[in-house]
Amino acid sequence: MFFLKKQEKIQVLVFFVGLSFFSPVAFSADFDNEFEEKPWKEIEVQLPPFPERENLIPFEVGSVTDKQFFIDGDSLSVGSDEVIRYTMVVIGSGGAQNISFEGMRCTTGERRSYAFGRSDKTWSRVRNGQWGKIRGGSNQGHVNLFSDYFCNVGERAILSPEDARRALRYGRSATFR
């Protein structure tokens, strides 16, 4: 650069300074900031109508229980927050029913309850309901919903209520034919 005139030196300097703004390092910093994952935010949840017997879809939990497990097909939804929401009905051998409106996050393996059904066919909202990990034991119905119907690892996620109903009625593998 020592053989260039002063004005040419300034032009070359400006060129290289300008070029540095487009360097991979400068670009990658902006790129990372633009595409940072935003923190997950749950959408506002509306309670569904109380389940009707004709809308209940049975699902298998295994031979270790004498309870019957159902999902209300009309309550199924998949939110923009990627939560599958549903009403679960569990009927014990003596006929007692437990009804709950719940959500499941396939990406984190968590679930939460939003409300429980009362005998007068109304909902009782859960106060301070928190997301918790899906584990076996007394929650076997949730484990089966997660692994066998809604969130099977390695397969496409349930994207719509129709996908979820099809998985419950015909098995997980029938969902994506």
Regions found by a protein language model. Give the residues of each.
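Bacterial N-terminal signal peptides that target proteins for export
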Residues: 2-13
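Cleavable N-terminal signal peptides
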Residues: 15-16, 26-27
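N-terminal secretory-pathway/extracellular module detecting exported/lumenal segments
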Residues: 27-177
